[in-house]
């Protein structure tokens, strides 16, 4: 990960346009290719960002070089750097991801044992399928043999959908697995998360943990 604190202006050029006037900002360049621009507020949310895959080039601009981040759709973040206060790179390695709480971990075990809950003809390939950005909870095959990545949460929120989206973007670059579909499974799924998942072609499945624990395997069903 590269961390840059700089006085800069930022312009987004794509389907829309957006301009951030000159200010001191934190620029994050991550190993997965993503680039994000942060201010000293908004919690974890960036002012602007570019999701991978994207590419960074530099255009000469005299005293203010322009860093151009371009994604596969041709959209650009154009960062005009006026002054760099800090620039450092750090090797973080592969993150093990969040440690699931007891309910999430048990949901993963139960769903792996009874993967037909996801649909007739589903089979399990592997639990904790490792990727460069962390493990996918379940990798399955559907009734037609297509690969399906499953993210399991106790409470399904937007962050979980974003996490699954990143996994899908990466897995779909693998010519052996692609195309890979996504399933977002949780005890409760917030409306905003469901809307975002549906917009991205991710199927949502609501699980009843208590009934999954108490029923025989041939009585499992979705609610």
From Swiss-Prot:
Q: Name one GO molecular function term.
A: DNA binding
Q: Main localisation, per the record?
A: cytoplasm
Q: What does this protein do?
A: Cleaves both 3' and 5' ssDNA extremities of branched DNA structures.
Q: Which UniProt keywords apply?
A: Cytoplasm, DNA-binding, Endonuclease, Hydrolase, Nuclease
The name this protein carries in UniProt is: Endonuclease NucS
The organism that produces this protein has a lineage beginning with:
Bacteria, Bacillati, Actinomycetota, Actinomycetes, Mycobacteriales
Entry's EC annotation: 3.1.-.-
Q: Does the keyword Electron transport apply?
A: no
Q: Which family does it belong to?
A: Belongs to the NucS endonuclease family.
Q: Look at the named UniProt entry and state the broad enzyme category this protein falls under.
A: hydrolase
Q: Where in the cell is it found?
A: Cytoplasm
Report the domain of life of the source organism: Bacteria
GO CC annotations?
A: cytoplasm
- Its gene is nucS
